[in-house]
Amino acid sequence: MSTEPAGAVEPSQAPRRPRGRPRKTADERDDGNRRQELMRAAAKLFRAQGFAATSTRDIAAAVGMHSGSPFYHFKSKSAQLAGVMEQGMHSALQRQAATLRAVQASAPAGAARSPDAALRALIRTHFDILLGPDSDFIPVMLYEWRSLTPKQRAAIAKLQHDYEAAWLPLLLALKDAGRLHADVHLARLLLLGALNWSVQWYDAKQAASLDDLADAALALFIPH
């Protein structure tokens, strides 16, 4: 005779306890839009407050997340910093490539693009990347380079190299035409260094327009 009470559930029929992590919240599941919101918020806070002074809690609060939710998207605050820089460089590369295509498309049929026009376009795009709307990503890279790990730094440096490589053919063409007298590698370093420094002093409410800046930079480095 069975000693179990009537209606008892066999072990094989008992409901199983869920295993693994608890079910993700909406903030944690939406890995696309929410991740981008985190990236933009992190870029803005890292630029305004600095990497060391910004906590993951600050970033989560900026987008209305719980304090632990960012860790479903990034392993650490350091990984988020590297992600901000990587996204900034990928965006910069895409915008630069689009600029060069537009310059080539605007050249007369069968003619090569003007190195002056192409360089001016690159300078203007670079200013927009640094100073235009949603422009926190690259300034964070300029400010917080030393906060990266060596492995992160190497990955971002590869993207930087690819971005800067597009400037060299234009400077070489200008040198061949007698318009540039400096070593092209040094000229590129000095030019980009001067443009990048604009994040320290530019004020859109008081300073010249980005077009004015591009014209002035071209005239300074490649005088007529």
Mark where each language-model region is.
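Amphipathic alpha-helical packing segments from all-alpha helical-bundle domains
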Residues: 90-97, 132, 136, 140, ...
